[in-house]
Structures are given as structure tokens and as C-alpha cells.
């Protein structure tokens, strides 16, 4: 039996969205679910206790960054990532591939792997499917990701075709190199750019390899949202119904709703934590940029409909002061709020699926959030 399994609870009669439970060695979580990103073994400014309080059920770690610092050997010595960071819930680690392709301009792709330069000190590094598996086995995450090639968007058709074929070959090598399948589930990553036939080919090739779960990669990288939705909708039909489906890099409220409707179960993104550090807050009325002068004497909470720690205790004026003064506590407060907002949104999505009314919920949410249902602007 694989380390991670998917239990289907129901399908929304109105939208076709899925309600399910993903079972892992470190606990189970309901889907659709948003996963906060803890790049360097921490969700920036948040303690594990605070993550539990806002009902985060699963978090991400980043293989590339943890390999470079502090090193997978140190984390293995500590008993794995869960013990190292004192998080007893599920953890998903990415393969390191996205960072290699996005952070390093000086890279050389061969069949063996990718040679590239360290993103800060310029030293020469090499990452292969086997090396990615070794690092992730050392980290001990519940869900590991296969090492894939991430073609830029847009890219020439022939380049993307060769890229997905290499991704499939690398996926086979990942399966062969994976040392702990009884403890850790390895997910395959479907690529294909914005080409429907290549997405289909990539999905079918990877499904033949029988991974315990599948991700859609290479989207949410700057393409218009209608293109992303079209690719998700097309690819979903070739993904197994009895396994988790993970859409990588998606975290805006509108996209979480739209892609839940299109059958996705798991999402991650640095968006809520990254914009929090700039003082941008997600609210039920849309985005709020707390640095704006009009909030200097505004004693209301960030969102009057929110019951998070930040909104129950602090005013816009105070949070604006902290952010303007570059006080760390301000970033903590906006981070707590943004993550709570998205996790509560996912809870609302799951409830709407239970009640067979996700399309109605989408319309209500978009109207309040200031989005046009027919043509949502990029949020």
C-alpha cells in the first residue's frame, strides 16, 4: 500500500469539484486544501503552533534551498524535517527542479541532469533525478515530487515536446532511485506548456508509471489565467480519479476557486506570505494595501468579516505603523491574516462542495471580492 492515499468523499453536483481526504504517515487532511510554503523549513515569521492555530494541515519544504542550507545530511541527522522544524503534520517537498530552472540563468541541461550555478555565490552545482530523490529521502517528507524539466512559458512546441519526453524518462529514474516508498509517496509532475496535446501525452505517459499522486506543473508562471484554467480543465480528464491531484504554484483566491471547480485537490503558493511582507492583505472585499495613507488613523481590523488573531486584536492603523516602521511584528500579523484568509476560503470551498453549491459560492465571493465572474482580472 502506498504511503499516501486518496479517499473520495463526494463530487459537487453543481460544479464537478471533488471533496476528499488525503491520508499520509503524519495525518490526514481534507481537500481541496491550500498548503503554506515553508521554503527553508519555516513558513516565514510563523511558528508551527501558529500554523496549527490557523488550521494549516500540510506545509511545503523546498529541496533546493534545504540542500544548500543547512544541508540534507544535517536534517537527516536531526531525524528528518518533521523533527528538525517541530512540525508533526504532513510535509510535501518539491524536487528542486523549479528553482534550478527559475533562479539560475547559467544552466546546462543534459540527459543526466542539470548543471547550474548557485544563486548567491556562483559555485557550480549538479542536480539529477537520483540526487533529488536522495535529498528528499533524507528530508523524510510525506510527499516527494519527481525531478522534472520546467520549460519556460511560452516555449517552442518542439522544445516542449522534447522536454516532456525527458520529464517522463527522469520520472522513471526517480521511481528507481526512491528508497523509502513505504514511508514517502512520490508524485509525478505533468508538463506540456500551453499545448493541449503535450499535456495529454505527458499525463498519459506518467499515469502508466502508476505514481500514488499527480501534479500539474509549469502553470501559474505568468500566463493569462484563462490559459491556465484551460490547461487544467484539459489535463484533469487524463488524471486518475482515485489519486490526489496537485496544482503547483497557485494561491490567488480566484484561481483556488476556479481550479477546485476544475477538479484539483491541493495547491501551494508563496503569494500570501510574500505579499504580506509588503503590507498587502487579502480581505473579503479584495486586496488592501496597508501602507496607503488613508489607513493611518483607521481603527478597524483588516477585515471585519475575519476571526483571525490579527483581526481580533489589532487595527489597520497599528499594522500600518508597524509595516511603515519595518517592525517584524507587522509582517507576522499580515502573514497570519493572509494564511488564515486562504485556509478559511478553502474551508468555505469544501463546505460549498458538500452543499452542491460551489458555482453559487464562486459568484457570491467574486462579487464581494470585486472580481467580474466572466472575466476575472489578474489578482
From Swiss-Prot:
InterPro entries: ArchSynthase1/Queuine_TRR (IPR050076), TGT (IPR004803), TGT-like_sf (IPR036511), tRNA_ribo_trans-like (IPR002616)
Region of interest (RNA binding), residue spans: 249-255, 273-277
Disulfides per UniProt: none
Source organism, top-level taxon: Bacteria
Gene Ontology BP terms: queuosine biosynthetic process; tRNA wobble guanine modification; tRNA-guanine transglycosylation
Cofactor annotation remark: Binds 1 zinc ion per subunit.
A GO term from the CC aspect: cytosol
Keywords: Glycosyltransferase, Metal-binding, Queuosine biosynthesis, Transferase, tRNA processing, Zinc
One GO MF term attached to the UniProt entry: tRNA-guanosine(34) queuine transglycosylase activity
Annotated binding of Zn(2+), by residue: 306, 308, 311, 337
Cofactor list: Zn(2+)
Signal peptide: none
Gene3D superfamilies attached to this UniProt entry: Queuine tRNA-ribosyltransferase-like
Coiled-coil regions, chain positions: none
Protein EC: 2.4.2.29
Catalytic reactions on record: 7-aminomethyl-7-carbaguanine + guanosine(34) in tRNA = 7-aminomethyl-7-carbaguanosine(34) in tRNA + guanine
Residues that hold substrate according to the record: 94-98, 148, 191, 218
Catalytic residues of the enzyme: 94 (proton acceptor), 268 (nucleophile)
Pathway note: tRNA modification; tRNA-queuosine biosynthesis
Family membership noted in the UniProt record: Belongs to the queuine tRNA-ribosyltransferase family.
Listed PANTHER family: QUEUINE TRNA-RIBOSYLTRANSFERASE (PTHR46499:SF1)
Quaternary structure and partners: Homodimer. Within each dimer, one monomer is responsible for RNA recognition and catalysis, while the other monomer binds to the replacement base PreQ1.
Function statement: Catalyzes the base-exchange of a guanine (G) residue with the queuine precursor 7-aminomethyl-7-deazaguanine (PreQ1) at position 34 (anticodon wobble position) in tRNAs with GU(N) anticodons (tRNA-Asp, -Asn, -His and -Tyr). Catalysis occurs through a double-displacement mechanism. The nucleophile active site attacks the C1' of nucleotide 34 to detach the guanine base from the RNA, forming a covalent enzyme-RNA intermediate. The proton acceptor active site deprotonates the incoming PreQ1, allowing a nucleophilic attack on the C1' of the ribose to form the product.
Protein name in the entry: Queuine tRNA-ribosyltransferase
Organism field: Staphylococcus aureus (strain bovine RF122 / ET3-1)
Amino acid at each position: 500500500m502506498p504511503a499516501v492515499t486518496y479517499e473520495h468523499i463526494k463530487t459537487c453536483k453543481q460544479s464537478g469539484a471533488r471533496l476528499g481526504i488525503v491520508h499520509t504517515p503524519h495525518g490526514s487532511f481534507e481537500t481541496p486544501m491550500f498548503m503554506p510554503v515553508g521554503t527553508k523549513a519555516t513558513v516565514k515569521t510563523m511558528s508551527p503552533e501558529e500554523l496549527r492555530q490557523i488550521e494549516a494541515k500540510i506545509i511545503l519544504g523546498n529541496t533546493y534551498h534545504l540542500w544548500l542550507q543547512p544541508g540534507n545530511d544535517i536534517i537527516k541527522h536531526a531525524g528528518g524535517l518533521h523533527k528538525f522544524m517541530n512540525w508533526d503534520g504532513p510535509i510535501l517537498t518539491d524536487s528542486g527542479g523549479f528553482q534550478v530552472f527559475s533562479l539560475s540563468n547559467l544552466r546546462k541541461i543534459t540527459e543526466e541532469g542539470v548543471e547550474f550555478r548557485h544563486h548567491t555565490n556562483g559555485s557550480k552545482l549538479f542536480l539529477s533525478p537520483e540526487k533529488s530523490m536522495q535529498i528528499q529521502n533524507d528530508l523524510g517528507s510525506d510527499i516527494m515530487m519527481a525531478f522534472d524539466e520546467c520549460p519556460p512559458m511560452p516555449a517552442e512546441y518542439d522544445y516542449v515536446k522534447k522536454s516532456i519526453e525527458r520529464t517522463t524518462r527522469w520520472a522513471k529514474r526517480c521511481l528507481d532511485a526512491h528508497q523509502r516508498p513505504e514511508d514517502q509517496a512520490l508524485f509525478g509532475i505533468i508538463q506540456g506548456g500551453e499545448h493541449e496535446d503535450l499535456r495529454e501525452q505527458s499525463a498519459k505517459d506518467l499515469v502508466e508509471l502508476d505514481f500514488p499522486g499527480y501534479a500539474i506543473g509549469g502553470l501559474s508562471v505568468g500566463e493569462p489565467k484563462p490559459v491556465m484554467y484551460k490547461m487544467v480543465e484539459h489535463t484533469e480528464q487524463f488524471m486518475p480519479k482515485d489519486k490526489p491531484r496537485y496544482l503547483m504554484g497557485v494561491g490567488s483566491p480566484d484561481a483556488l476557486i476556479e481550479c477546485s471547480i476544475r477538479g484539483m485537490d491541493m495547491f501551494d503558493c508563496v503569494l500570501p506570505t510574500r505579499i504580506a511582507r509588503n503590507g498587502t492583505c487579502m480581505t473579503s472585499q479584495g486586496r488592501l494595501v496597508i501602507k496607503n495613507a488613508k489607513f493611518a488613523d483607521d481603527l478597524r481590523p483588516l477585515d471585519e468579516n475575519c476571526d483571525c488573531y490579527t483581526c481580533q486584536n489589532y487595527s489597520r492603523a497599528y499594522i500600518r505603523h508597524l509595516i511603515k516602521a519595518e517592525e517584524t511584528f507587522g509582517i507576522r500579523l499580515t502573514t497570519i491574516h493572509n494564511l488564515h484568509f486562504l485556509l478559511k476560503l478553502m474551508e468555505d470551498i469544501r463546505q460549498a462542495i458538500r452543499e452542491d453549491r460551489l458555482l453559487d459560492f464562486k459568484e457570491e465571493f467574486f462579487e464581494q471580492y470585486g472580481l467580474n465572474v466572466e472575466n476575472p482580472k489578474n489578482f
